[in-house]
């Protein structure tokens, strides 16, 4: 279905930011592009070779492994429908970068230089050390655009656009405007923003501070201070400062975390134990699998989670197709849906949509030409357009709230006007 680095993806989806990389050499097109002996890397007369890079394992236990399942589900359907302009997708699966920059770059090099892929889709990690390599080797790459590397490089695309703007670009206002709706307006409301102590977290704090202020909030606390490589065992130093940051030394109306799930569980548990009754929000904890443990369910109860795609609770034709594709790829089982599946699925979908438009003679050049004029509407991430998506997000999203062990839509999926970033 045609249709945009992860400490920031905790920051800009809402964004857990990350970095990635690339590699390999692109052959010329001296042979006829559609022939079986075509010199286009990863393209034969009947197949297009694609690989992925995903943080399947991490030191904290957090995993994005279902990103691979989501991508496979979409590629499987494309193949079942006859492929792309007569070519099947030969999806090699995702390389595990372990959320490690060196492994991310190594994965990119392997896929390009050893496996000879035409494209990398999905790429989902909080690190994208392979980005320069992939772009330099002209490898079309699609993933979750929560890292700066998804904003500007010619051959790299975010499945829902660029979520990490550069000066002169724009900011997605889905999160602040959505929370303003939940709180009955932003006027007179205060918000605390917290992120990990790394470049991605610092950039996330910068962007969200501007965004929440533009929406009318008072930003009472905005710090990227949590150790990014080791989760705190004691959150009191952070909670005490947050709970005294509001007007008059009181608690803020909302606490927004731009961190990954294990960190959010620790922070939110500590805030609740301290008696905090305000709104809690993050961009990563939309995952029914998290609810299997009572402690996790309690920590996340009441939390508003930012989504940049239609909620699974939606009953649109596109969502019904997504669920059917995931079920089939999972062997006919009704597996719990999560945002990583959507990341993989829509990364694959954007790649397929552009490749379809490129036509039978698929080369890097024809793919890029197709991308330069690509647009579609009504997808699971809203209306898509390139190269616009390499400079700004598609601007759409929703908020869901965990209530008594179930997710419910708090703010329906819609698109918001962006604001200038500077």
Could you describe each region identified by the protein language model?
Residues 33-72, 94-101, 196-203, 336-342:
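Extracytoplasmic "Venus flytrap"
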Residues 161-165, 270-345, 414-418:
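Extracellular/periplasmic periplasmic-binding protein-like sensory domains
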Residues 17-20:
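C-terminal motif of bacterial Sec signal peptides marking the signal peptidase cleavage site
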Residues 102, 157-274:
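Extracellular/periplasmic Venus flytrap/periplasmic-binding protein
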Residues 197-200, 205-207, 261-266, 311-373:
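Extracellular/periplasmic ligand-binding modules, especially the Venus flytrap/periplasmic-binding
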Residues 36, 62-69, 81-153, 226-235, ...:
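Beta-alpha junction/loop-to-helix N-cap segments that form part of ligand/metal-binding clefts
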Residues 22-25:
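Bacterial signal peptide processing site
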Residues 31-37, 48, 375-422:
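Solvent-exposed, acidic/polar segments of extracytosolic/periplasmic ligand-binding ectodomains
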């Amino acid at each position: 279905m045609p249709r945009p680095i992860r400490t920031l993806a905790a920051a800009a989806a809402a964004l857990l930011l990350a970095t990635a990389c690339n590699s390999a050499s692109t052959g010329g097109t001296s042979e006829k592009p559609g022939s079986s002996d075509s010199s286009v890397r990863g393209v034969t007369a009947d197949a297009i070779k694609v690989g992925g890079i995903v943080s399947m394992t991490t030191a904290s236990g957090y995993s994005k492994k279902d990103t691979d399942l989501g991508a496979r589900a979409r590629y499987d359907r494309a193949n079942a429908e006859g492929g792309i302009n007569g070519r099947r997708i030969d999806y090699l699966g995702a390389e595990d970068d372990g959320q490690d920059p060196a492994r991310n770059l190594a994965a990119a090099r392997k896929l390009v230089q050893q496996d000879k892929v035409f494209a990398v889709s999905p790429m989902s990690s909080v690190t994208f050390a392979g980005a320069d390599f992939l772009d330099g080797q002209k490898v079309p790459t699609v993933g979750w655009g929560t890292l700066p590397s998804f904003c500007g490089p010619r051959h790299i695309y975010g499945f829902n656009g660029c979520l990490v703007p550069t000066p002169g670009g724009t900011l997605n206002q889905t999160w602040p405007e959505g929370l303003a709706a939940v709180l009955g307006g932003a006027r007179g409301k205060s918000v605390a923003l917290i992120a990990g102590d790394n470049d991605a977290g610092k950039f996330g704090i910068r962007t969200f501070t501007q965004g929440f202020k533009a929406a009318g909030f008072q930003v009472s606390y905005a710090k990227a201070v949590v150790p990014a490589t080791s989760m705190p065992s004691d959150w009191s130093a952070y909670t005490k400062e947050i709970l005294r940051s509001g007007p008059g030394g009181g608690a803020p109306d909302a606490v927004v975390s731009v961190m990954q799930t294990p960190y959010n569980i620790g922070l939110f548990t500590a805030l609740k134990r301290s008696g905090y009754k305000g709104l809690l929000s993050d961009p990563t904890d939309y995952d029914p699998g998290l609810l299997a443990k009572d402690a996790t369910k309690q920590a996340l109860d009441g939390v508003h989670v930012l989504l940049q795609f239609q909620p699974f609770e939606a009953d649109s034709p596109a969502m019904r197709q997504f669920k059917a594709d995931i079920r089939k790829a999972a062997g006919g089982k009704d597996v719990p849906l999560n945002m990583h599946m959507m990341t993989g699925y829509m990364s694959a979908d954007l790649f397929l949509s552009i490749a379809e438009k490129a036509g039978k003679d698929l080369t890097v050049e024809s793919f890029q030409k197709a991308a330069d004029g690509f647009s579609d509407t009504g997808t699971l991430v809203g209306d898509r357009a390139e190269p616009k998506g390499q400079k700004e997000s598609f601007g759409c999203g929703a908020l869901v709230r965990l209530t008594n062990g179930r997710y419910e839509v708090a703010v329906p999926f819609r698109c918001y006007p962006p604001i200038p970033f500077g």
